[in-house]
Amino acid sequence: AWLDPTLTYSSAIFAQGDTLEAAQQRKIDAVLDRVNVPPDGTLLEIGCGWGALAEAAGKRGIGVRAITLASEQQRHVVARTSGLPVAVSLTDYRDVRGMYDAVASIEMVEAVGERYWADYVKAIARALKPGGRAAIQFIKIADDIWSGYRANVDFIQAYVFPGGMLIHEPQFRALAEAEGLTWQDRHAFGLDYAETLLQWRLNFDKAVADG
């Protein structure tokens, strides 16, 4: 009732005058541009959601393996990407085998929990071919409130993402570097998340009003 037509449940990246749908597509394009998959290359998407990124990558001619733990999402993405070079499976990220030119994972790691951050980055490092790139979009917690946040359960952890945790970037970055991954690019767009949330709220309120 509140998502845009792409069914993307993560922050968009807005330019002046963008609709939510246009901003979500802008974000997807930015992710695909950053990983820069070669022609006829391959992409692993960890946590494919409802398939917007997998569809966009498939339309670029990229061979996509998309994984999810939700059977409803799998069915939806299979239908959405029919005719494209996209394979969708019910697979835990720790069970992925094979190597890919790139990995994309958009706001999935928050649901993993701190205990499994190391497993998550190990899975990404293992899946990348030499010279491959990963794009990871995550919601971070400010360094100065990390200790207090970590020691307590807030509303989001209790009711939205049980067991999840926002990312402490220095710790997460160290785990990634321990697996041989190097940090090539960083783009922070917190104000875009605020606008995304506003648009979701407006969509939700309209859906309620429309019955």
Question: What does each of the following model-derived ranges do?
Answer:
Residues A1-R34:
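Conserved Class I S-adenosyl-L-methionine-dependent methyltransferase catalytic core
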Residues W50-G61:
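Conserved SAM-binding loop of SAM-dependent methyltransferases across substrates and taxa
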Residues R94-V103:
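A short acidic, Gly/Pro-enriched loop at the edge of an enzyme's catalytic core
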Residues K140-G211:
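Substrate-binding/catalytic lobe of Class I Rossmann-like enzymes that use SAM or dcSAM, i.e.
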